[in-house]
Amino acid sequence: METSKKHKIIKQISLFAENKPGRLANVANKLKSAGINIKAFTIAESGDFGIIRMVVDKSEYAYNVLHTSGFTVSETNVLGIEMKDLPGSMSHIAEVFGEAKINLEYAYAFVTRDQKALLIVRVNDIEAAIKTLEEENIKLIDMKELEKI
């Protein structure tokens, strides 16, 4: 992958945690104690366990903190897409991916302090997604921009 495309990739932290009260608090407290800010997260339930996916301001450090705390943790390459916080913005992104035959595996979104909507996505072909989004003049944020949010 060429260097310019690598800079568009965000490292997402994923971890498995028991689906019981207090587990999210435990994870969040570990990150808080390490001075790591959670920018966005989602939880997917899977029976007795859940998958917590999050983007943070210090992904490598977060990975190490959680791993050494005994969590099963991994890093995943995702994209951060800046959208207008208006009806139809999600539809446009979905259409762009559909027309390019890029499968959207999962997504979660949040709104920044300055009222920009950001969509975090995992796709089946990240290089094709970057190329397609850039051709459509859709802004991708990188880790440095994410850290400032």
What does each model-identified segment do?
Residues M1-I149:
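A conserved regulatory-domain signal marking ACT and ACT-like small-molecule sensing domains
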